[in-house]
C-alpha cells in the first residue's frame, strides 16, 4: 500500500493488523482527551509496527501518519500470531527487531540530552537527513513537533532555525 504525506495509517485506540514500513517515514502521535497531540515516535524503513504488538495483540498506542510518501506492507494479525506459534524461532527475529529499536532510542536519547539546544537540533537534523534528503526537517515536522521531540519550546526552535538561516 502507498501512503502519501499526511495520510493516516492507523488511529490510536483501534486494533488491527501489523505493518512493515518498506520505505518512507511515519510519525506516531498521541492524541489526548483535550484534542492536543504530542509526537511520541518516528518509524523508519524496515520497522514492523506497532512494536508493542509484535508478540501479542494490543490496541494502537498512537496514530500513525506519513511524513513523506511511504510504501507499507499490511501484515494480518491472525496470520502474524499463528506464524509465531508455528515457528518459535521467529521470536528471536522479533527480539532482534526490538533490540534495533532500543538502540535507535538510545541514539535519540543522546540527541535530547545534548547540553545546548542548538546541538540537539543539529543532531536531529543530521539524523533526519539519512531518511528525507533532499527535504529538510522543517519540510516534514512542524516547529511544535520538533520541540516536542527535543523537549524544547517551539519559540526556541524558531529562534534556532532563524539563527541557522542567518549563518548560511
Q: What residues fall within each predicted segment?
A:
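Short beta-strand segments in beta-sandwich/barrel cores
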Residues: 8, 25-30, 48, 71-72
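Short beta-strand His + acidic residue motifs that chelate non-heme Fe in jelly-roll/DSBH
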Residues: 28-29, 51, 62-66, 149
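A small-molecule sensor/coupling module
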Residues: 79-116
Amino acid at each position: 500500500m502507498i501512503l502519501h504525506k499526511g495520510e493516516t495509517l492507523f488511529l490510536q485506540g483501534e486494533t488491527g493488523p501489523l505493518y512493515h514500513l518498506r520505505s518512507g517515514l511515519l510519525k506516531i502521535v498521541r492524541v489526548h482527551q483535550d484534542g492536543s497531540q504530542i509526537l511520541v515516535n518516528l518509524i523508519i524503513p524496515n520497522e514492523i509496527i506497532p512494536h508493542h504488538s509484535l508478540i501479542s495483540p494490543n490496541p494502537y498506542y498512537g496514530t500513525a501518519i506519513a511524513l513523506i510518501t511511504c510504501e507499507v506492507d499490511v501484515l494480518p494479525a491472525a496470520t502474524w500470531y499463528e506464524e509465531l506459534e508455528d515457528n518459535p524461532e521467529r521470536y528471536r527475529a522479533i527480539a532482534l527487531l526490538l533490540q534495533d529499536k532500543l538502540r535507535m532510542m538510545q541514539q535519540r536519547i543522546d540527541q535530547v540530552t545534548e547540553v545546548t539546544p542548538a546541538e540537539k537540533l543539529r543532531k536531529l537534523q543530521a539524523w533526519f537527513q539519512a531518511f528525507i534528503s533532499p527535504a529538510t526537517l522543517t519540510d516534514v515536522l512542524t516547529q511544535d513537533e520538533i520541540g516536542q521531540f527535543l523537549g524544547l519550546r517551539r519559540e526556541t526552535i524558531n529562534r534556532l532555525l532563524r539563527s541557522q538561516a542567518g549563518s548560511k
